[in-house]
């Protein structure tokens, strides 16, 4: 009887401990260790790339910096884990990272079968093709019989197979796990075509020996909504990551920038006051301070600032806003209201 009671007691204690850990969740873990562990690419200029001093920057990096600003009031409290396409989901599932912000496409399978949640879209992309100008090709429909370089374990690999089959063209896949291996193989002439998300083509072209000798073809063959990913079952962390991105988008729409956010603390616009934490208790609902969005905007900037700084027309990538412009300016970028 005593053994039974002891076993029941131990079982209850273990259940309570497990429940406590589950309740604590990722946000509590992040606060305890003092930083956000962010999964990023192994080097994609404009999105997640480290300079010679190891400082990370990019559109995806800014999401992680925004999360850190919301949690700690300090956007620098982030550590980065470079991951290949094959490694990224396992790293998130295992708890090696807190959030994956790595040019990752939101698909039905990834959202429903891997135990993961996508927290929004920070870049609307589409798959494209890059070739050498000397090939004399002006359309992807002229690529029949080509050798195509791509990454393993990506939607890119699946999309290219669908595209060539749908257009009754033969092709050969030359696939690698790491992006630098793909770029290197293409640069050395091991394949005729390099395919990935179009934003990635512009970014990786900068790494080629003679970047001006290559063109991105006009066809976009897929929808690739890219965004941050978290584990399922932790709604508090999911909400925080989701609303970090939403705050940046809302800030751009309201005209709140890193330069003017201090003056916005006395705005007469109720929506702005809610955004910067002067009205409402939205930070408390997220488990952080009510100045969470103010800190994001002050230290990282709004979505438009992040886009322009990392991938916009004045950067080496030179990407126009296109569909990533605000809904009010001809694009589809849109966030729910903070109210």
Residues of each region from the PLM?
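Solvent-exposed, polar/charged alpha-helical surfaces in well-ordered, non-transmembrane soluble domains
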Residues: 28, 61-69, 90, 94, ...
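Acidic, polar ligand-binding/catalytic clefts
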Residues: 65, 69, 73, 77-142, ...
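Bacterial N-terminal signal peptides
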Residues: 7-17
């Amino acid at each position: 009887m005593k053994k039974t009671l002891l076993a029941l007691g131990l079982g209850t204690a273990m259940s309570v401990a497990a429940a406590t850990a589950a309740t604590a969740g990722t946000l509590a873990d992040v606060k305890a260790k003092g930083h956000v562990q962010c999964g990023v690419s192994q080097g994609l200029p404009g999105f997640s790339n480290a300079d010679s001093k190891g400082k990370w920057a990019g559109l995806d990096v800014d999401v992680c910096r925004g999360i850190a600003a919301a949690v700690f009031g300090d956007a620098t409290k982030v550590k980065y884990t470079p991951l290949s396409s094959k490694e990224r989901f396992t790293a998130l599932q295992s708890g090696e990272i807190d959030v994956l912000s790595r040019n990752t496409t939101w698909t039905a399978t990834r959202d429903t079968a891997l135990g993961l949640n996508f927290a929004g879209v920070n870049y609307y992309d589409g798959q494209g093709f890059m070739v050498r100008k000397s090939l004399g090709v002006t359309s992807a429909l002229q690529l029949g019989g080509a050798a195509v370089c791509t990454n393993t374990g990506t939607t890119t690999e699946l999309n290219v197979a669908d595209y060539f089959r749908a257009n009754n063209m033969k092709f050969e896949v030359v696939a690698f796990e790491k992006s630098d291996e793909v770029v290197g193989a293409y640069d050395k002439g091991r394949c005729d075509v390099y395919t990935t998300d179009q934003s990635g083509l512009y970014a990786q072209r900068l790494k080629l020996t003679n970047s001006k000798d290559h063109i991105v073809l006009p066809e976009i063959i897929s929808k690739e909504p890219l965004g941050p990913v978290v584990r399922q079952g932790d709604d508090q962390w999911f909400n925080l990551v989701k609303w970090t991105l939403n705050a940046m988008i809302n800030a751009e729409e309201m005209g709140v920038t890193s330069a003017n956010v201090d003056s916005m603390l006395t705005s007469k616009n109720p929506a702005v006051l809610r955004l910067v934490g002067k009205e409402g208790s939205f930070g408390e609902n997220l488990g952080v301070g009510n100045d969470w969005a103010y800190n994001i905007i002050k230290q990282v900037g709004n979505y438009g600032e992040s886009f322009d700084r990392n991938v916009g027309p004045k950067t080496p990538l030179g990407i126009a806003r296109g569909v990533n412009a605000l809904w009010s300016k001809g694009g589809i970028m849109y966030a729910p209201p903070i109210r």
